[in-house]
Amino acid sequence: MQMYDSDIPKILKDYLNYNANLNKSKATITEYRYDLTNFLKYIKLLKLNDRKLTIDDISSIKDIDSKFLNGIDLNDIYAYMSYLKDCCDDKPATRARKVASIKSFFKYLHLKAKLIDDNPAKELESPKLGKRLPKYLTLEQSTELLHNVKSKELTGRQHDNTLRDYAIITLFLNCGMRLSELVSIDIGHIKFDENILTVVRKRRQRKNCLFK
């Protein structure tokens, strides 16, 4: 069982533990906790119906129970999504991630925990996302970057960490990995005799990268 903030409701703690049991990554569980804590704070503010209050005035959601959750409908959720867009300036990709968090939470409450009679997020739609072209460095830019990492002009800690930094940049360039994937590398992921690095991708998918 994981330890979570004392001011979040037991229902949310149970949901986070459920995801930990499914072997979801710590990063994913942290996102769920952040997204759902803010969502529940907003809904609590919405139900208070006091225009003098703001979401910052909601200091705790520990008292939220199944009765409260049964009172949430689809319009409440869309009100929260509008708040994220208009007041928080969240980009479509950020709002889409939060939609996924909310849908997963209510699906758990309805089908697994059986704490709510209906799933208000079942018909919740995600913002449309424009296609983003991948950004990449040219061969010349990559070469210059690696050259600068090994520059003799570096001093102090920069000089001491030259080999580490060179290895990090090389992995980024050659494997196209994310920062979260890089920091998750364990010594057991490296086969030195075969020059193979196993990268753990999203959804626990694995990719082998060759290195020299």
Question: Across the structure, where does each feature detected by a protein language model lie?
Answer:
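Conserved catalytic core of the tyrosine transesterase superfamily
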Residues: M1-K212
